[in-house]
Amino acid sequence: MAELGEADEAELQRLVAAEQQKAQFTAQVHHFMELCWDKCVEKPGNRLDSRTENCLSSCVDRFIDTTLAITSRFAQIVQRGGQ
């Protein structure tokens, strides 16, 4: 097998990083689903009632807001460290 050139290796690393990000995002979504499901759904049925739908929506929104706040704060810390 031929060795990869620098450009090919960089592209491969970029693709691997993108796949890792997708996997991390998927894992995070499943984690949110599990936590919010356990918090909001008392007994599964054919349909979700409005209270359960609102609870699930609010739960996911809280996790997204928290994740964005933490990410933003971390970026600020990293940026200050690089100055």
Curated annotation (Swiss-Prot):
Segments carrying motif Twin CX3C motif: 36-59
UniProt main location, coarse: mitochondrion
A Pfam family assignment: zf-Tim10_DDP
One BP term from GO: protein transport
Highest taxon, organism lineage: Eukaryota
Membrane topology designation: Peripheral membrane protein
SUPFAM superfamilies, alphabetized: Tim10-like (SSF144122)
Disulfide pattern: C36-C59, C40-C55
Signal sequence coordinates: none
Gene Ontology terms: cellular component: mitochondrial inner membrane
A GO molecular-function descriptor: metal ion binding
PTM-bearing positions, type N-acetylalanine: A2
Keyword tags: Acetylation, Chaperone, Disulfide bond, Membrane, Metal-binding, Mitochondrion, Mitochondrion inner membrane, Protein transport, Translocation, Transport, Zinc
Compartment(s) of residence: Mitochondrion inner membrane
Domain commentary: The twin CX3C motif contains 4 conserved Cys residues that form 2 disulfide bonds in the mitochondrial intermembrane space. However, during the transit of TIMM8B from cytoplasm into mitochondrion, the Cys residues probably coordinate zinc, thereby preventing folding and allowing its transfer across mitochondrial outer membrane.
Subunit description: Heterohexamer; possibly composed of 3 copies of TIMM8B and 3 copies of TIMM13, named soluble 70 kDa complex. Associates with the TIM22 complex, whose core is composed of TIMM22.
Protein role: Probable mitochondrial intermembrane chaperone that participates in the import and insertion of some multi-pass transmembrane proteins into the mitochondrial inner membrane. Also required for the transfer of beta-barrel precursors from the TOM complex to the sorting and assembly machinery (SAM complex) of the outer membrane. Acts as a chaperone-like protein that protects the hydrophobic precursors from aggregation and guide them through the mitochondrial intermembrane space.
Stated family: Belongs to the small Tim family.
Full protein name: Mitochondrial import inner membrane translocase subunit Tim8 B
Organism: Bos taurus (Bovine)
Gene name of this polypeptide: TIMM8B
